[in-house]
């Protein structure tokens, strides 16, 4: 019942202007067990819950439909990034998303 009060009703949500003005920026730092360090940056313009997610879903579908020969044949249950790898990353970059990894 708490979520019903917090979440928008079906058909409600941010205006087109708010969806366009939205964005997300993530920065992560990781260290391997051997001590190597990495920085990761992921960014996209557009509301993350509406516009950016729609781009990710659309590009994932196109990747599955059009890039299938470069994807694993069988591997069990995978995340989109594991299943589609660099093919999906390149599609998302072409759609305006940023994905960068650098060693520290």
Predicted regions mapped to residue ranges:
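C-terminal catalytic/substrate-binding lobe primarily of soluble NAD(P)-dependent oxidoreductases
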Residues: 1-104
